[in-house]
A protein has these predicted regions:
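Generic enzyme active-site microenvironment
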Residues: 5, 113
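ATP/adenylate-binding site constellation spanning eukaryotic-like Ser/Thr protein kinases
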Residues: 116
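Conserved short hydrophobic patches within well-ordered secondary structure
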Residues: 94-99, 111
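Catalytic P-loop NTPase motifs of RecA-like helicase/translocase cores
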Residues: 11-12
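PIN-domain endoribonuclease scaffold, especially VapC-family toxins
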Residues: 2-4, 15, 23-91, 101, ...
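Conserved glycosyltransferase catalytic-site signature
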Residues: 8, 40, 96-97
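Residue-level detector of intrinsically disordered, flexible termini
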Residues: 1-2, 96
């Protein structure tokens, strides 16, 4: 797998030492050789769970790599809105819809998430499923 998209569950596990998946996130990161893409809304969503020090650490980690932050152009909002509408019964958040949009644009199906229920339902263009990367348990 050349690239994966990271959801907030992965970043939270990585950034909070007491998270039960912290060691698994660190181990995955140490072994993974591909690119990790983080949509900018996922950065915002992740910071909600962090202390100020953890927010600063996350931003420093993102600045240094190996992850790349993907910004969303305003032109994407109509498509993201359509994705939100398509999955309204799941009550998706903006970050999830942004991940679906970005995955379509990048042709990237791999995702680092703890939200296997929703990402098992979301579909990319052409009906393709996400490939949920096993990074914990």
């Amino acid at each position: 797998m050349a690239a994966v998209i990271a959801d907030s569950g992965f970043l939270v596990a990585l950034g909070i030492r007491r998270d039960p998946r912290h060691a698994a996130a660190k181990s995955f990161l140490a072994a993974y050789k591909g690119e990790i893409v983080v949509p900018s809304p996922v950065v915002v969503e992740s910071c909600f769970f962090f202390s100020t020090a953890a927010k600063i650490s996350l931003l420093d980690w993102l600045r240094k790599g190996p992850a790349r932050v993907a910004e969303l152009p305003p032109q994407a909002y109509a498509e993201i809105g359509a994705i939100l509408g398509r999955y309204a019964s799941l009550d998706p958040d903006f970050a999830d819809a942004a991940i679906v949009w970005l995955a379509d644009k990048l042709g990237c199906r791999g995702i680092l998430t703890v939200d296997t229920r929703d990402f098992g339902v979301y579909r990319l263009k052409g009906g393709k499923r996400f490939e949920i990367v096993r990074w914990f348990g």
